[in-house]
Amino acid sequence: MPKRSPPDTSPVARFEQSLQELEQLVQNMETGALSLEQSLGAYERGIALYRECHQALEQAQLRVRILSDPMHPDDGEPFDPSLVSTSQ
């Protein structure tokens, strides 16, 4: 049986899932059915998801820039996520 590679847990790989969860949180908050405590928890989770999505977009943008530098099209190199700063 072939070994399965571990799932990619980079922000870019999780972007769609994070965005979908964020959209669901927003919908839940907009209904007004959440208590104050639930709303604060949802808001806190939403901020974390927003940051994940933002980081994923920055990494994707950097990856595209590295791979398609118009001044040096033959110098494309594989993307190394460890080179991206994760501080905010």
From Swiss-Prot:
Gene3D superfamilies: Exonuclease VII, small subunit (1.10.287.1040)
GO biological process, one term: DNA catabolic process
Keywords from the named record: Cytoplasm, Exonuclease, Hydrolase, Nuclease
Residues in coiled coil: none
UniProt cross-references to InterPro entries, sorted A to Z: Exonuc_VII_S, Exonuc_VII_ssu_sf
Region described as Disordered: spans on this chain: 69-88
Transmembrane segments: none
Keyword Hydrolase: yes
GO cellular component assignments: cytosol; exodeoxyribonuclease VII complex
Known EC number: 3.1.11.6
GO terms of molecular function: exodeoxyribonuclease VII activity
Compartments where located: Cytoplasm
Known catalytic reactions: Exonucleolytic cleavage in either 5'- to 3'- or 3'- to 5'-direction to yield nucleoside 5'-phosphates
Biological role stated in the UniProt entry: Bidirectionally degrades single-stranded DNA into large acid-insoluble oligonucleotides, which are then degraded further into small acid-soluble oligonucleotides.
Subunit organization: Heterooligomer composed of large and small subunits.
Alphabetized HAMAP family for the sequence: Exonuc_7_S
Family recorded in the similarity comment: Belongs to the XseB family.
The protein's name: Exodeoxyribonuclease 7 small subunit
Gene name in the database record: xseB
